[in-house]
């Protein structure tokens, strides 16, 4: 009988120990589940931060590409303005040459007109001399008539030359007026281009400032990219470590669940044995 009582006491103590161990295992299992949930939350947070970091990196690269495109467009516009200024400078030089040639033609026409006027005056004087010497001999008259005819011919030629010179002078004046009009238009265009050049110069200075600022932003972007890249790598490493930790915790949870199941089975076996013992005692 004493042996049975001792056995019952031992079995009771073993049952209590099994209950304590089961409670400890359940508490440890709950703590493990909480740690697992916290790690999973950290892992999800790291994934969100990783996605945000990648988005920030894409936005930074897009902004950098936009700044570079604007700078290239500005450089192209400056080159086009410089080519237009060079073209207008060549046109102005050609107009100045045309004006010089027109002035030379005008001077030549004026000289020819002066010669024609002198010839006409000389013919008029000869005619008057012939009238005053009307009483000379026939040979003298014939000679004078010949001189008069020659003088008339010279006068007619002079008139023709005068008319031709006047016509050429009129044409020259028209050409000169056109050249002056083109020159005025060219000067106006030059003034306009100078104003545009001033604006372009101001724009260039502004663009240089913007370019300097863009360079500073680019340096800042590069630093940000490096920082984001490092943060991304760190997040990836932490995510990898979290995955490993989650895997370990899952294995630990499985082990604890198996151990808890074993303890429950042992507890059931002890309970069954106690029930059998009580039944045996009741039989006495």
UniProtKB/Swiss-Prot annotation:
Function text: Tropomyosin, in association with the troponin complex, plays a central role in the calcium dependent regulation of muscle contraction.
Polar residues bias (residue ranges): 44-60
Coiled coil region boundaries: 1-284
Assembly and oligomerization: Homodimer.
Domain of life of the native organism: Eukaryota
Species assigned in the record: Mytilus edulis (Blue mussel)
Family in the record: Belongs to the tropomyosin family.
Gene3D superfamilies: 1.20.5.170, 1.20.5.340
Domain remarks: The molecule is in a coiled coil structure that is formed by 2 polypeptide chains. The sequence exhibits a prominent seven-residues periodicity.
Higher taxonomy: Eukaryota, Metazoa, Spiralia, Lophotrochozoa, Mollusca
Protein name (record): Tropomyosin
Keywords recorded for this protein, A-Z: Coiled coil, Repeat
InterPro entries with a match to the protein in the record: Tropomyosin
UniProt biased composition (Basic and acidic residues): 32-41
The keyword DNA repair is annotated on this UniProt entry: no
Region feature (Disordered): 32-60
């Amino acid at each position: 009988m004493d042996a049975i009582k001792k056995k019952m006491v031992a079995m009771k103590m073993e049952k209590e120990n099994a209950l304590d161990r089961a409670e400890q295992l359940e508490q440890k299992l709950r703590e493990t589940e909480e740690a697992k949930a916290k790690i999973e939350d950290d892992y999800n947070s790291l994934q969100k931060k990783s996605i945000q970091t990648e988005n920030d990196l894409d936005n930074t690269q897009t902004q950098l590409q936009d700044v570079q495109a604007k700078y290239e467009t500005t450089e192209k516009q400056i080159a086009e303005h410089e080519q237009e200024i060079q073209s207008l400078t060549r046109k102005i030089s050609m107009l100045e040459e045309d004006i010089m040639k027109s002035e030379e033609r005008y001077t030549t026409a004026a000289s020819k007109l002066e010669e024609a006027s002198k010839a006409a005056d000389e013919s008029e004087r000869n005619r008057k001399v012939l009238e005053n010497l009307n009483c000379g001999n026939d040979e003298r008259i014939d000679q004078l008539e010949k001189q008069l005819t020659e003088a008339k011919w010279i006068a007619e030629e002079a008139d023709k030359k005068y008319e031709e010179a006047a016509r050429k002078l009129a044409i020259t004046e028209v050409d000169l007026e056109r050249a002056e009009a083109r020159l005025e238009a060219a000067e106006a265009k030059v003034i306009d281009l100078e104003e545009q050049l001033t604006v372009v110069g101001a724009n260039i200075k502004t663009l240089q400032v913007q370019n300097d600022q863009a360079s500073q932003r680019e340096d800042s972007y590069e630093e940000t990219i490096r920082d984001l890249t490092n943060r991304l790598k760190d997040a990836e490493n932490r995510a990898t470590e979290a995955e490993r930790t989650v895997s370990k915790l899952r294995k630990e949870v499985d082990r604890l669940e198996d151990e808890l199941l074993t303890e429950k089975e042992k507890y059931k076996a002890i309970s069954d044995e106690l029930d059998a013992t009580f039944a045996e005692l009741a039989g006495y």
